[in-house]
Amino acid sequence: MVRKVAVIMGSDSDWPVVKGACAQLKALDIPFEAHILSAHRTPAGAAEFAKSARANGFGVILCAAGMAAHLAGAFAANTTLPVIGIPKIGRAHV
């Protein structure tokens, strides 16, 4: 069975960070789903998604959110699947 990739954003403003990854997954015909889940605004929803990800057919979780790595950490704390944090470069990074 081919497992899906979960592409998780902390908010819709993180879309520019993940749209290239989604385009590449689509081009390679790799099944994926993109979701907006916040470690701060919707922590219970994020935790539940992570806990049930394997049972829902996911094999890896990509997380991109703001200037901090909290989202990837919140997901990694709630799943045994690989979680990859995608950094968002901002004004604070020089």
Question: For each of these PLM feature ranges, what is it?
Answer:
Residues R3-R41:
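Glycine-rich phosphate/diphosphate-binding loop of Rossmann-like nucleotide-binding domains
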Residues F49-P87:
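Glycine-rich phosphate-binding loop
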Residues P16, A44, H70:
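Residues that form or flank phosphate/diphosphate-binding pockets in enzymes
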Residues M1, A46, A69:
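Residue-level detector of functional hotspots within protein domains
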Residues F32-N56:
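N-terminal beta-loop-helix "entrance" segment that forms/cooperates
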Residues V18-A21, A46, F75:
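Hydrophobic packing residues within well-ordered alpha-helices of enzyme cores
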